[in-house]
Regions:
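Accessory, often C-terminal, charged low-complexity segments
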Residues: 1-123, 128-129, 144-148, 152, ...
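Conserved helicase NTPase motor core
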Residues: 124-162, 166
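Conserved proline-anchored active-site loop of SAM-dependent methyltransferases
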Residues: 149-168, 477-491, 603
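Active-site-adjacent bridging/hinge elements
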Residues: 162-171, 428-443
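Active-site-adjacent structural elements in folded domains
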Residues: 181-182, 444-450
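Conserved SAM-binding loop and adjacent beta-strand
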Residues: 448-459
């Protein structure tokens, strides 16, 4: 509707414009069912580092009053003559400093990654994380080329659309008076989630999305529409332990975590702290002997083959024999009992005939292994118990220690050292998930001032991700709403705890807050200016937090105080993490230069990411383009001049660790010919 209203406003005939507006308003008020929103809300991205030239699309830098997209007719000195896309008969002249080139959604783009900075605190490790400063839609387009179907876990904390001007849509802040803010939020998320779905491993991966009560209903419906083939679960996580009272409504203490399970994905059973143990869960207990006699839905006639005698010696210490099932109608008293034995039948306390939980042959195998235990004689027979499949698995896996066998042949299990592993319920009341203490205060200890509102608790993010990557030490984890950088901090903590090699990619824009934007504009600065950009979230929050947490100091260089919670042995924050991160800014290449093959150096970081970001990202020095690159430390190679293929193949043979190559050629037949002569796993 927003796009239609913009078009209606451009109708010159006032009578016609008013009639059309009236009819459209009637349509908008009609009752609709299901999740209905404006899916085609206009959205574009400013390209501050792209030159303005004839034929490109531009917007005014201060687009609050004029969000129109203009087409540049000509550039002369410091001005550009432009026309609106819809009205090409009225030319307008702008100063170049007042406009910015933009990319509309659906427009062909040529992204590249420009190195900004890096931190290397593990020079001997080939593991490198990545932070990308970008509009996340365009970053996801690039990542689709790099990692389609390869991501194990996506964790995102998108803007909650509170109406407090805490996020931007189409280069403008969205506030609570915006009639289309829900459509903008859903359209914004829909576009990005469609791309995110392509990145996830369809056989085994998860999408994790956190949200509050304002948008969880809409988000849940959207996820259901976009992922109809999956199972979706919602967790309630207590994140505010000090609730601020609100007038005429309940205080907010929780947020919600949607988990979208793809393929065979499931949470891992983990050893958990006492906070998780707030409801009864049998999987948390030690060794459990189950009653062999079923107590419910257990009449003899329901399973006749489960009604048979167990012959126990008169002293009650040993099973001498297991009898055969008797047919329905036969009186159990007619069964002969071996000398020196007592026949034990599955009889309920009310005297009714029941059935055993195991068939004759299955029980015999359990007895042979010592997995059946005899109790005392009772009025109706004897209490007999056994170990079920889950308990036996814990014995055979070594979780329970068998210390011997008693005189009846039953195993003696030592479960004193057993640490219960289990999947908790979906109501999390975990002290470490407190966003104030372990989010806001933790971030302030790194940055020494408040630079970001409502950061996540490090441990809430850590725990949520851990359920799905605990058994994936080489998992690829993506967060394309990186915010303050909690996700990478959590991944580094996970790797430090269990020696994992998990890799994290974070994407964030470099927006400033609404208040900061006003302050900067009052001083005469505009987006793209250095003074503006240095206060953006990527440079002012995400990257400093990443560097400080890895190197173990605050922004002033002073060692961090305290230990990470729940780690054994204690992990000191001042020790940092053995981790490396490369920081890039997503830029856009001129299509003409790309077609002429003039911008290879800018493409190198993309190729590095394509091959798994192993080792430090290589750089080309000098203007001379080499014929080839052989990069054993990065485990890939590039042939730039196909006329040197023979030399390339010879050098490549010296490095069997290189299993990925990129071959530059204009002809498919040449590419196929070269690939046939290379012994590598991947060629592009």
């Amino acid at each position: 509707m927003a796009a239609i209203n913009d078009l209606i406003s451009q109708i010159q005939d006032e009578t016609l414009r008013n009639r059309i507006q009236e009819e459209v308003s009637k349509m908008a008020k009609q009752k609709k069912f299901g999740l209905v929103f404006e899916e085609h809300m206009p959205e574009s991205t400013p390209l501050y580092d792209m030159p303005i030239k004839r034929g490109c699309n531009v917007m005014r830098r201060d687009s609050k009053d004029d969000k129109s997209i203009y087409v540049v007719l000509k550039v002369e000195d410091d001005t550009a003559a432009c026309v609106k896309q819809e009205q090409k008969d009225e030319a307008v002249t702008f100063e170049l400093k007042d406009i910015v080139r933009v990319a509309e959604f659906g427009e062909s783009i040529y992204p590249y990654l420009m190195p900004v900075d890096s931190v290397c605190n593990a020079p001997d490790s080939d593991l490198w994380h990545t932070l990308i400063e970008a509009d996340n839609y365009h970053a996801l387009q690039l990542l689709e080329y790099l990692y389609a179907g390869k991501v194990d876990c996506i964790y995102i904390d998108p803007p909650y659309n509170t109406g407090a001007k805490d996020w931007k849509y189409n280069n403008d802040y969205v506030d609570g008076n915006d009639a289309y803010r829900h459509s903008k939020g859903l359209s914004f998320m829909q576009r990005r989630l469609k791309l995110a779905k392509k990145l996830l491993n369809p056989k085994d991966s998860v999408l994790i999305v956190t949200i509050d009560e304002r948008e969880y209903l809409r988000l849940g419906c959207l996820l259901g529409e976009l992922f109809p083939e999956t199972h979706i679960q919602m967790i309630s996580d207590l994140i505010n332990r000090v609730v601020v009272a609100k007038d005429n409504e309940f205080g907010r203490s929780t947020e919600y975590i949607f988990i979208v399970y793809l393929g065979s994905a499931s949470p891992a059973k983990l050893p958990l702290e006492e906070d998780w143990n707030h409801i009864e869960n049998s999987t948390k207990d030690g060794i459990h002997w189950a009653n062999l006699s079923r107590t419910t839905n257990s009449r003899r006639q329901d399973r006749p083959n489960m009604f048979y005698p167990i012959f126990v010696t008169r002293d009650g210490k040993r099973i001498a024999k297991i009898g055969d099932p008797i047919p329905l109608g036969q009186d159990r008293a007619t069964v002969s009992v071996p000398s020196g034995c007592v026949a034990v039948w599955p009889i309920h306390t009310n005297g009714e005939e029941g059935r055993w939980m195991q068939g004759k042959d299955g029980l015999a195998k359990l007895v042979q292994k010592g997995y059946v235990r005899l109790g005392r004689f009772t009025d109706t027979g004897m209490a007999i118990s056994y170990l079920n499949r889950a308990q036996i698995q814990k014995i055979e896996s070594g979780e329970y220690i068998v210390s011997g066998y008693d005189e009846s042949g039953t195993v003696i299990v030592d479960d004193s050292t057993y640490s219960a592993t289990y999947i908790p319920d979906n109501l999390w009341n975990i002290k470490t998930h407190d966003a104030a203490r372990n989010g806001t205060n933790l971030l302030s200890s790194l940055l020494k001032e408040k630079r970001f509102s409502f950061p996540k608790s490090l441990y809430s993010t850590h725990d949520t991700i851990r359920f799905f990557v605990a058994n994936k030490p080489n998992a690829l984890i993506l967060d394309f709403f990186a915010g303050s950088g909690t996700t990478m901090h959590a991944v580094n903590l996970l790797n430090a705890e269990d020696g994992g090699h998990r890799r994290c990619i974070m994407v964030t824009n470099n927006e400033v807050s609404a208040d900061e934007a006003k302050m900067l504009k009052d001083k005469g600065y505009q987006p793209g200016d250095a003074e503006w950009e240095k206060l953006g979230i990527a440079h002012y929050v995400t990257w400093p937090r990443t560097v400080c947490s890895i190197e173990g100091h605050d922004v002033n260089g002073k060692p961090l105080k305290g230990d990470y919670l729940g780690s054994e042995p204690p992990m000191h924050m001042a020790d940092g993490f053995k981790a490396n991160v490369a920081f890039f800014k997503l830029g856009f290449l001129d299509p003409t230069a790309v077609s002429l093959g003039m911008r290879f150096s800018e493409m190198l970081p993309t190729l590095w990411l394509k091959t798994g970001a192993k080792g430090k990202c290589p750089e080309l020095t000098g203007e001379q383009m080499p014929d080839m690159l052989i990069l054993p430390e990065n485990q890939f190679a590039v042939l730039i001049n196909e006329n040197t293929f023979a030399d390339f193949a010879e050098k490549l043979a010296e490095h069997p660790e290189i299993q990925t190559v990129f071959l530059a050629t204009d002809y498919e037949v040449n590419y196929q010919s070269m690939v046939k002569n290379l012994n590598v796993a991947n060629a592009y």
